[in-house]
A protein has these predicted regions:
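Divalent metal-coordination and catalytic microenvironments
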Residues: 11, 47, 57, 90, ...
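Active-site metal-binding loops of divalent metal-dependent hydrolases
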Residues: 16-17, 58-61, 98, 119-120, ...
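Core dinuclear metal-dependent hydrolase active-site scaffold
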Residues: 13, 44-48, 54, 157-188
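Metallo-beta-lactamase
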Residues: 2-4, 74-85, 89, 119-172, ...
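Cap/insert and terminal regions of metallo-dependent hydrolase folds
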Residues: 70, 74-78, 182, 186-270
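Conserved beta-strand hairpin/beta-sheet module of binuclear metal-dependent hydrolase folds
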Residues: 16-78, 182-196
């Protein structure tokens, strides 16, 4: 059921990179066969209504991809142009968390307010960053970048769940990081959840076998349940790194196949 005074959003998942790996890298309890190929994709997302354009996460740079051994297919910021979005004009960017693959390129959004959870800023600049295992997925330049934007009065903090705009809500879960959040949007097919890293892969959720980069395992598993509860059905859940998103959902046009998916539309074959 649509909320009162809701806006209806088109939702775009834009793939900008991949990483070839085995199943053992993607699950806390490696499934059999644990050495089978199990790549992940890297995405940014865009939520577009008649009145608002909101970018969700900002991806990583080519330099970051090279340092970390990731396949960088295209610039995530430039790729927004594929769906008619000029990053220089975007006024609202949701940072679901500040890991390197979600919080880079902030300087490419000169007019944006960056939305982040209180707990994420505290986590990535606090005592837990003394430990390499917890800071490994953060890029110090990105962390300095969001602090710089704070001093430029361009960061909006959120403490838990909130409505950003009519029909677009933010939900804190923690787990993967202390300040991990996801986005829920009202679409023509109902409530769709852009889970980001609250749920990396469909199988992490369905098999109750979470992704192994985690601050609190229990919070991550509870986060899977919250994602599922706030989506209208399992087909309304969009994981943060699953290659099947490109296979399941239609592209806006044939030339954007395997680059952009319209996740506000029903999966193919339904």
């Amino acid at each position: 059921m649509a909320p009162p005074m809701s806006e209806t959003y088109k939702l775009y998942a834009i793939k900008y990179g991949t990483h070839a790996r085995t199943a053992a890298r993607n699950f806390m309890q490696p499934p059999d066969p644990h050495d089978a190929p199990y790549p992940i994709d890297y995405y940014v997302w865009a939520c577009v209504s008649e009145n608002h354009t909101v970018v969700v996460d900002t991806g990583f740079t080519k330099d970051a991809a090279e340092r970390r051994g990731r396949d960088w297919h295209r610039c995530p910021v430039d790729s927004l142009k594929l769906v008619g979005i000029d990053a220089a004009e975007v006024t609202d960017v949701v940072i679901t968390h500040m890991h390197y693959d979600h919080g880079g390129n902030l300087d490419r959004f000169p007019k944006a307010t960056f939305h982040i959870q209180d707990q994420e800023m505290a986590h990535m600049t606090g005592r837990h960053m003394r430990y390499p295992v917890l800071r490994h997925s953060y890029d110090i330049e990105d962390v300095c970048g969001i602090v710089r934007e704070l001093y430029n009065d361009r960061v909006e903090f959120h403490d838990g769940d909130t409505e950003l705009f009519p029909g677009l809500t933010l939900h804190h879960v923690g787990g993967h990081t202390q300040g991990m959040m996801f986005v829920r949007a009202w679409t023509e097919r109902g409530w769709v959840v852009l889970a980001s890293d609250a749920m990396h892969l469909y199988a992490n959720w369905l098999d109750r076998n979470p992704y192994p980069t985690v601050v609190h395992i229990g919070d991550m598993l509870e986060g899977h349940r919250k994602v599922a509860r706030l989506a209208d059905s399992p087909d309304h859940v969009i994981p943060g790194h699953d290659p099947r998103v490109m296979d399941r959902y239609p592209a806006p046009s044939e030339d954007l196949k395997d680059i952009v998916a319209r996740v506000d539309l029903p999966p193919r074959g339904t």
